[in-house]
A protein has these predicted regions:
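N-terminal, motif-rich segments that launch catalysis or mediate targeting to/interaction with membranes
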Residues: 18-149, 156-287
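Cleavable N-terminal signal peptides
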Residues: 6-7, 17
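N-terminal signal peptide c-region/cleavage motif recognized by signal peptidases
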Residues: 12-16
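Positively charged n-region of N-terminal signal peptides that target proteins for export
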Residues: 1-4
Length: 289
């Protein structure tokens, strides 16, 4: 059995990156949970307690914890990555992102009818809102998906171009980091703050929580969030896009060289995106649970 879970984790971690990394998801969901009312926190905890044992093991193995370790909301939000290579969940793989044609200028609601990240948020918010008093596996899954999707939609490369798989084919010619392409770099390596990165991110974002209050949840907001990420990913400093005179994005070389100050320059962008993701998740859960 231990070998079975090890293989699942290896497969999930060795494939191309299509999801914000563990650290980002944990930070978003822990911050959101901490800013819920005590009543809403209790409702989240009740749903987490209903996670089947098999899926608790999957979450813990994915996070390099002992199989029977307690599950909190931070670790539970990594569940959609822990299970996405399982046959029964393969249908959800495209839901982690939204890739558009290279000539796209902005994101609109009719750009995606199903099987993409904005629609995934709407779908699982609706499922979670149904039969609020019930504790069942369908609602538990919706909670875990929803927490995960809020992290993904705020990572700019999750709303990007189809012809290079959202930056997964844009590789580096010089970096020795474990993140071998631009999408992967923004999923994980851009969040690096040395030892205890998670604690540092939580402290930083907690201190800034009240500086940018967010409006109450409305369904049309998901397209605004996608548009925010899309415009960020098209900005010249990210080294992913060269705008032409028609404001569409020209493809960059398959291998690029990032400036030496790239991490310092752009980590502040992910700081803003993680904060917004957590605040907006808090608003959704407050309305939905």
């Amino acid at each position: 059995m231990k070998l079975f879970f090890f293989i699942l984790v290896f497969i999930a971690s060795s494939s191309p990156s299509f999801a914000l990394g563990k650290l980002g998801h944990q930070v978003v969901c822990q911050l959101a949970f901490e800013h819920l009312s005590l009543t809403k926190q209790a409702q989240v905890s009740t749903l987490l307690n209903a996670i089947p044992q098999r899926h608790k093991h999957l979450i813990n193995n994915y996070n390099y914890k002992k199989p029977n370790s307690p599950i909190n909301f931070a670790s539970a939000c990594t569940w959609p990555d822990a299970i996405k290579r399982l046959e029964e969940y393969k249908t959800y793989q495209p839901w982690h992102y939204m890739n558009v044609p290279r000539d796209h200028i902005y994101i609109r609601a009719n750009d995606c009818r199903k099987n993409c990240l904005p629609q995934a948020i709407l779908k699982h918010q609706q499922v979670l809102a149904q039969t609020k008093s019930e504790v069942n596996w369908q609602r538990v899954q919706a909670l875990l998906f929803l927490g995960h999707w809020l992290g993904d939609i705020h990572q700019p490369f999750h709303i990007s171009f189809a012809d290079d798989f959202g930056g997964n084919r844009v590789k580096f010619s010089h970096l020795t980091t474990k993140c071998k392409n631009l999408h992967w770099y923004w999923d994980e390596c851009i969040l690096y703050k040395g030892r205890n990165s998670k604690a540092k991110w939580l402290a930083l974002l907690t201190a800034k929580w009240h500086l940018h209050p967010q409006p109450n949840w409305q369904t049309e907001q998901v397209w605004q969030w996608a548009e925010e990420s899309f415009q960020l990913v098209k900005s010249a400093s990210l080294s992913y896009c060269q705008l032409n005179n028609q404001y569409s994005c020209q493809k960059v070389a398959d291998k690029i060289r990032l400036p030496e100050n790239y991490l310092q320059q752009h980590q502040v962008i992910m700081e803003q995106r993680l904060l917004l993701a957590a605040q907006r998740l808090t608003k959704i859960l407050t309305t939905t649970l």
